[in-house]
Amino acid sequence: ASSDTAKKNSGGKMALQQIFYGAPGTGKSYEVNSITKKNRYATIRTTFHPDSDYSTFVGAYKPTMANAPVYGAQGVEIAKEKRITYTFVKQAFLKAYLGAWQKLANGVDSVEPQFLVIEEINRGNCAQIFGDLFQLLDRSGNGFSTYPIEADADLQNEIAKEFGQGGEYMLANEFNVDYAVPDYISNYGKTLTEDIKLGRILLLPNNLYIWATMNTSDQSLF
């Protein structure tokens, strides 16, 4: 498999973003898998298809069954029963995004990489799937996204919850990444670090690697 490198990482050893392309059976997925497994890199994988969209790539609220309280006439909880509630379900991109920031924030001597591997990237409508996330793929020399973007309300709330106290991806209190975008001006009067922690903006960290495979013989291309 050959590769199309979009941007080298700041260390110059691995490309932050690249596409492995070729005919079927030429070892595209094998090459990606051998690199990530050999080095024991944290990896989240997804496969694009014609029905893929932003919600299946990033996340969205979905109905789930959960125990909900049942209240009596006096307003006192008397029992619990299964009811349909709506929960934000994280998908591949958001899991990788949260994992990368956690590794960057909590790394002491070194920062572990986080990989997001997209199989068959050409089988999905990338404009529909990525949306404004495309802007984040433009990386600066330091490996961070050049242009932070605003997160929508649902995504903002989920990120703030996960990065906050008790969250699955809780960030270290002393974490500071203001250096990532030197000319950053917040729309909220805050620092870059604060806006990232609160989920107000999205910014790819320099340890998030997005690698994809593309089948050049596939006829269902977008």
Report residues per predicted region.
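AAA+ P-loop NTPase catalytic core and its hallmark functional loops
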Residues: 1-222
